[in-house]
């Protein structure tokens, strides 16, 4: 019972609250002898300092005990150390310790002491935090000596730097606001009282030899009296009124500084001051005083803060020169997708072929043993190539969602930053993280940012940092284990600029082309977006018709189209989204937004109306000759945000087309130049600059027909670009020269002749339909819009002259005449 009482007394003494690790607490507690057979209690006190301090204080007291009892205690203590968070431990609250001691006392004898020792030897569990568990460490002090305080740092050096920075700000603010308060270990500053007196009092004090020190600044004079005189001056009423505003701190000296202003016509009594041995001088204006010093100190504080924020060196107990990311992430912008909105293949439509290519990847990630046991090597990398907006990133997310594995995504531009060597280090960290969480997926978006070819064709100057990053990426991709279960997905829209070493089998084994969707794919994409948004559609909306109107649209374009249609319907306060909303959204995507206030007037309005009618007349004549060609459905002379003053809408064909025949190309050339031809006919040769975009597009089409498509008889089936570059040599060399000046001149002459022939044919078509040109032009000028059946009623009387028929069928008579004339 005596032993239990001693243990209870010791625990009660240990339950005193510990506020801070002061010097008095660092002394070990005195020993307490046990009254029952020499058995003793081991007590551990944990003092957790307030939040913000970076140390944990641990005191342990080890007392002597008999060998047998000591062995039992050590065995039980080891078991307590190995137990989890739910183990019993002695607390610093007095009631719990007293209850435990009382229970031990009832058991009696040595067993009670041993039980108490076992419970008390269990270390307290520190509270967990989001930054990780504090590193509490226990050290056994051999020899049974007196217990010691153990100090363990639980914060990193960077956090300690910020704590010191905050302390510096606090001291700076304290010195600025309360300069009279002394810092620890320094003498308190004397409180200064400034008293303004007349200049006559200053002269009288000089004559009486009462002045100790004078500071002259032009006509402004500050002076202090001698100590015995200053003591008497403290009792004057004007001085007491000046000192009432200053805090009266005990033990803080005060001083009085008198100020006065010297009249400009009176000299300063320097001779009298020299005679009375008065210290005098002028202020040093090279230093800006208190404000300048404060600004300098503030600049230093801000500079230290910036350095601590951006410095990539860790001040922790690890390597002093170890580089790490300033954002506390070794992998740069790499992040694991933890979104609850999981993307699957059901959310991806219009790219069925790409889905099939990626299904095997998904199956491998779900069941890798199925392939590994057969000796099959899974694809180490899959490169997704396609136009912007076709869904490359969405496909990668769908692969991760189907396989239910960690999806680590990053952008290739995040690898290379300011610090040299950071790119390669981040690549290593990224792949190490992926291997640790395998099976997993690494997705590198816009991989061409760091993987451009190193042969000099696609770079202007050398960039060693990017080359190091690329080399590390090549090494990591080629250094996978066969069972690592980590797959790399890369996305780019510039596969031609990638380094050949990256595209070879063994790194990116598969290249999946993600193309723009066809008509059925566009319809599927529209259904997905409509169902996701739960869009209320009108009865006149047929998504197959919308898909037919949007030839060439990508998945991102279609998503934006659905959103624009919903916005237009909401702008009109509609309850449902109608077909007209989708049509307006398509026109906004193609031609821009109609301007409500910028209206054409006068002669410009008439010219633009005839220009658009010229396109419609020539396009209708071409459609009459070529079956299956779409017809003009809408004319408008309302200016749009894209810079177009007029708009001629010709919908795409009802079926997807992948080839363009020579007669269709010639028909498009004539249609593009129909507006310019109408201006020449109506204005008698006084044309405008309104055909700028038409001429640009027609020139591009004619050049490709001559120089790339091989549709010209004089040039023949030759690719002029390949011929001028010296072939398709991968190294960029020129095996047989690039001096092809005569060929370039010939191409230019052929392009010019083709465009001139198309313009002459367009003039013939416009002159053959004067009634439609004038009548429809005047009607469009008045109404600003013509569409639908009303437009078709005007265009049904358009005729196609024989010149158009000859030109579309490839007759070269006019072209040859132009060449002979030149």
UniProtKB/Swiss-Prot annotation:
Topology in membrane: Multi-pass membrane protein
Binding site for ATP: 386-393
Gene Ontology, cellular component aspect: chloroplast thylakoid membrane
Cofactor note: Binds 1 zinc ion per subunit.
Catalytic site: 612
Protein name as it appears in the record: ATP-dependent zinc metalloprotease FTSH 7, chloroplastic
Region annotation (Disordered) ranges: 1-44, 67-136
EC number(s) given by UniProt: 3.4.24.-
Any one Gene Ontology BP term: proteolysis
Family: In the N-terminal section; belongs to the AAA ATPase family.
Signal sequence, renumbered to the chain: none
InterPro entries: AAA+_ATPase (IPR003593), AAA_lid_3 (IPR041569), ATPase_AAA_core (IPR003959), ATPase_AAA_CS (IPR003960), FtsH (IPR005936), P-loop_NTPase (IPR027417), Pept_M41_FtsH_extracell (IPR011546), Peptidase_M41 (IPR000642)
Superkingdom of source: Eukaryota
Residues that span the membrane, as ranges: 154-174, 288-308
């Amino acid at each position: 019972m005596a032993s239990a009482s001693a243990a209870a007394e010791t625990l009660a003494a240990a339950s005193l609250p510990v506020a801070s690790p002061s010097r008095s607490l660092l002394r070990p507690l005195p020993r307490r002898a046990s009254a029952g057979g020499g058995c003793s209690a081991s007590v551990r006190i944990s003092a957790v300092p307030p939040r913000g301090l970076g140390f944990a204080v641990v005191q342990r007291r080890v007392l002597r005990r008999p060998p047998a009892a000591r062995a039992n205690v050590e065995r039980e203590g080891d078991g307590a150390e190995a137990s989890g968070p739910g183990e019993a431990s002695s607390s610093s609250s007095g009631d719990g310790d007293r209850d435990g001691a009382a229970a031990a006392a009832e058991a009696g004898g040595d067993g009670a002491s041993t039980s108490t020792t076992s419970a008390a030897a269990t270390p307290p569990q520190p509270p967990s935090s989001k930054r990780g568990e504090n590193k509490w460490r226990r050290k056994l002090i051999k020899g049974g000596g007196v217990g010691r305080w153990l100090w363990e740092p639980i914060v990193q050096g960077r956090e300690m730097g910020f704590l010191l920075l905050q302390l510096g700000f606090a001291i700076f603010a304290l010195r600025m606001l309360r300069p009279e308060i002394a810092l620890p270990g320094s003498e308190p500053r004397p409180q200064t009282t400034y008293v303004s007196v007349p200049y006559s009092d200053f002269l009288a004090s000089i004559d009486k030899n009462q002045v100790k020190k004078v500071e002259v600044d032009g006509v402004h004079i500050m002076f202090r009296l001698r100590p015995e005189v200053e003591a008497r001056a403290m009792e004057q009423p004007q001085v007491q009124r000046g000192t009432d505003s200053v805090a009266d701190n005990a033990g803080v000296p005060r001083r009085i500084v008198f100020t006065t202003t010297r009249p400009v016509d009176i000299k300063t009594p320097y001779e009298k001051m020299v005679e009375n041995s008065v210290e005098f001088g002028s202020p040093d204006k090279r230093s800006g005083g208190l404000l300048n010093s404060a600004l300098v100190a503030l600049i230093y504080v801000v500079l230290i803060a910036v350095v601590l924020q951006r410095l990539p060196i860790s001040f922790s107990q690890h390597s002093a020169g170890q580089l790490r990311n300033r954002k506390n992430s070794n992998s740069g912008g790499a992040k694991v997708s933890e979104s609850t909105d999981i993307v699957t293949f059901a959310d991806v439509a219009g790219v069925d072929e790409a889905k099939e290519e990626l299904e095997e990847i998904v199956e491998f990630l779900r069941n890798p043993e199925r392939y590994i046991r057969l000796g099959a090597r899974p694809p180490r990398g899959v490169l997704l190539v396609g136009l912007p907006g076709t869904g490359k990133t969405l496909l990668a997310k769908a692969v991760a969602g189907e396989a239910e594995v960690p999806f680590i995504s990053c952008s290739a531009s995040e690898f290379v930053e300011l610090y040299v060597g950071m790119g390669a280090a981040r690549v290593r960290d990224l792949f190490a993280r992926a291997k640790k969480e395998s099976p997993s997926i690494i997705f590198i978006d816009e991989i061409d940012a760091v993987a451009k070819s190193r042969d000099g064709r696609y770079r202007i100057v050398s960039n060693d940092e990017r080359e190091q990053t690329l080399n590390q990426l090549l090494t990591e991709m080629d250094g996978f284990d066969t069972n690592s279960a980590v797959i790399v997905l890369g996305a780019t829209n510039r596969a031609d600029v990638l380094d050949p070493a990256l595209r070879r089998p063994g790194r990116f084994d598969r290249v999946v082309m993600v193309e723009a969707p066809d008509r059925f794919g566009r319809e599927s994409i529209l259904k997905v977006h409509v169902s996701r948004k739960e869009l209320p559609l009108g009865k006149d909306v047929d998504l197959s018709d919308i898909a037919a109107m949007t030839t060439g649209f990508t998945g991102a374009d279609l998503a934006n189209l659905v959103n624009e249609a919903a916005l237009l319907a909401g702008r009109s306060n509609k309850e449902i989204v109608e077909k007209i909303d989708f049509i307006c959204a398509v026109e906004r995507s193609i031609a821009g937004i109609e301007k409500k206030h910028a209206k054409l007037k006068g002669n410009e309005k008439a010219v633009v109306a005839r220009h658009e009618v010229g396109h419609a007349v020539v396009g209708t004549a071409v459609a009459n000759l070529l079956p299956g060609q779409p017809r003009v459905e809408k004319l408008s002379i309302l200016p749009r945000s894209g810079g177009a003053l007029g708009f001629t809408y010709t919908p795409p064909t009802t079926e997807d087309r992948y080839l363009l025949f020579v007669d269709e190309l010639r028909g498009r050339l004539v249609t593009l130049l129909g507006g310019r031809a109408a201006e020449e006919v109506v204005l008698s040769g006084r044309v405008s600059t309104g055909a700028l975009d038409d001429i640009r597009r027609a020139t591009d089409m004619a050049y490709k027909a001559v120089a790339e498509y091989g549709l010209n008889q004089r040039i023949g089936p030759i690719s002029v670009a390949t011929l001028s570059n010296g072939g398709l040599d991968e190294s960029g060399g020129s095996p047989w020269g690039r001096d092809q000046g005569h060929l370039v001149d010939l191409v230019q002459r052929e392009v010019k002749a083709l465009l001139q022939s198309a313009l002459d044919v367009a003039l013939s078509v416009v002159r053959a339909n004067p009634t439609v040109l004038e009548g429809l032009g005047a009607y469009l000028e008045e109404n600003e819009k013509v569409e639908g059946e009303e437009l078709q009623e005007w265009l049904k009387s358009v005729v196609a002259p024989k010149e158009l028929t000859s030109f579309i069928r490839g007759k070269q008579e006019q072209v040859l005449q132009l060449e002979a004339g030149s």
